[in-house]
Amino acid sequence: RELARALAREMDALGVERDGRGWRGRAYLYCLEVRCPQSGWMVPVLPTLVISEGHRVVARLVPDPVRKRYDISIEYVDAARWPEEKKRAEAQGTLPRAEKGTLVHSPDGITAYRTRMSTIRGDYRDEQGNNRNRLRPWEKEDIVPRPEDILQERLYCVQWIRETEEAGRAESQFRAVTEADLERERRVTEYVRAHLADWEAAGLLPDMKIEAGYNTNQPMRERGWTHWRHLFNPRQLLAGAILRRHMTAETAPFVMNALNWNARLSVWNKGRDTVQNIFYNQALNTQNNYGCRGSAYLGNVVEGRMSPCPLPEGVAAEVLNLPAEQWEEGYDFCVTDPPYGDAVNYEEIYEFFIAWMRRNPPEEFRGWIWDSRRALAVKGTGEGFRKGMVRAFRRLSENMSSGGSITLMFTHKSGALWGGWPGSSGRRGCG
């Protein structure tokens, strides 16, 4: 709870979350914005114009012919009109699912311009047959797109909350973005820029490059992001740096979980008015629109609790974290989460968190090896995969004490992989 209070306190001191009328920003909704090559208009990239199903809120695109861009208004719809308006708002998104990757907009309501997003990105194949595009690779110090970038980003809606007299409840309101909101955005961006070097030196922000890989190629290819910090917008970097500064060994799991729920990859769930976690499907999927949590909403994540399980009096315990194939010490209990064939590349996903922890971790974690050790990951399917697992479980079996146990975490849709487990674990005495 102290961690959440510290986050809210520092955000309040900066004056970047309150509107001056008693409302605090709960969720900030952002989307990509691109220039249509046919019309020259800047177009927000929105798969749907539905903002909230529960509150019956939609966005409206308001053409501005002078600036050749769209203002975005926010409208509450009455219950009687909602089914029809919801259907219309779903269809009027600029990147509707039915168009399958095509940007669609009509400044005058008559002429519709359609352009493939692949064309806007400048997708092509190089001489070696690799997929490429014209997106600029971000520099390490970039925290927002540069003016000349193909993919811009804009704030298009803010959900505000205000405490009510009824304990534990808050009033909610979705609003269009105002000039005051944009000024607060500018203040956040400039503040982060001014402190970027100091925060990096103190280990409060990631300085790590994204290494090429099956999952990690996606944000590099689809957004031009080159460093892990690029997966976070200025508000998210600010919140992350504050949490990181106040983090202890006990609160580290909650801080890392907060990062999972607050990044440029966090889906805005219009059905539940929630900013979703990134790793709901163990991937690094980029989003055309996403949600950012304000401090009060992010505080819900860092206020989590872990149930302690004290050891019996006189019993000492040591927790070790090593690759199974390198295990050489005796142990009593083992928890292992083996690779899911080729389905989940944990060694790549770990780097999302390693980037935040490797510099200046809490004292209790100083001895940890902050490296994903990709080369050591047992990968693949078939005979090579099974042999790798047999070697790993043989080593675990050889070092387990009498009466010890292994907790195996494994989920997969492949019956063939499940069928291989008896040969990998059961026959090694680990079943």
Task: Cite the ranges covered by each PLM segment.
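Residue-level preference for long, well-ordered alpha-helices that form the structural scaffold
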Residues: 381-385
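A short glycine-rich, Lys/Arg-flanked "PGG" loop and its adjoining helix->strand segment in the class I
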Residues: 386-402, 423, 427-428
